[in-house]
Amino acid sequence: LLSRRQRQMCIRDSTADAFVLRGAKIVYVDIRPDTMNIDETKIEDAITEKTKAIVPVHYAGVACEMDTIMDIAKRHNLKVVEDAAQGVSAYYKGKALGTIGDFGCYSFHETKNYTMGEGGALLFQDENYLEKAEILREKGTNRSKFFRGQIDKYTWIDYGSSYLPSDMNAAYLLAELEEHEKIDRKRMAIYNYCLLYTSDA
């Protein structure tokens, strides 16, 4: 997303690495103690003329106040990149987390709600980002076009990495997603149990 220095982001530190690697300057915004999410009332004070995006983290699958965040982004002409790493199958006012902003990111790391050991998914609203996403996924090459027969050879275009999961890992993830309602019920039962026995502490 960012490749020039001195651009700024409003973001949590656990999400910062991807932006720092592209030369962005990170601006931290404090959290709300009730949700552990970004405090939407403090975002505008952190915005400068160099700010390019707001990156809300839906901590533990609890939704940030996306209406307010999207309104701020619109007024300041900023992109919104949702870190929905823990937000698969979680919603904000009927909308799936990761599908509200310009971009959404899911994680399938072993510590997340649904896992294939590693990896994730990138969602975006504007289909013009599709080619860039494919290049990032294919080690910085236009290999996807080659496999579709759109070009006769592929080459390096930009930076990227090897983000393609193995068939086996994808099969693990698919099996979990097919059981998402059962998994969600179990997680909610554990949450309610913990809440019940810690509320008096």
Predicted regions and their residues:
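Generic leucine side-chain signal with a strong bias for well-ordered alpha-helical environments
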Residues: 1-2, 78, 177
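Single conserved hydrophobic/aromatic residue that forms the stacking wall/gate
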Residues: 1-7, 11, 197-201
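Short glycine-biased active-site loop of nucleotidyltransferases that positions the nucleotide triphosphate
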Residues: 2, 95-98
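PLP-dependent aminotransferase-like
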Residues: 5-84, 91
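Short loop/turn motifs at secondary-structure junctions
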Residues: 6, 50, 99-100, 116
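Active-site region of PLP-dependent enzymes
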Residues: 87-93, 100-199
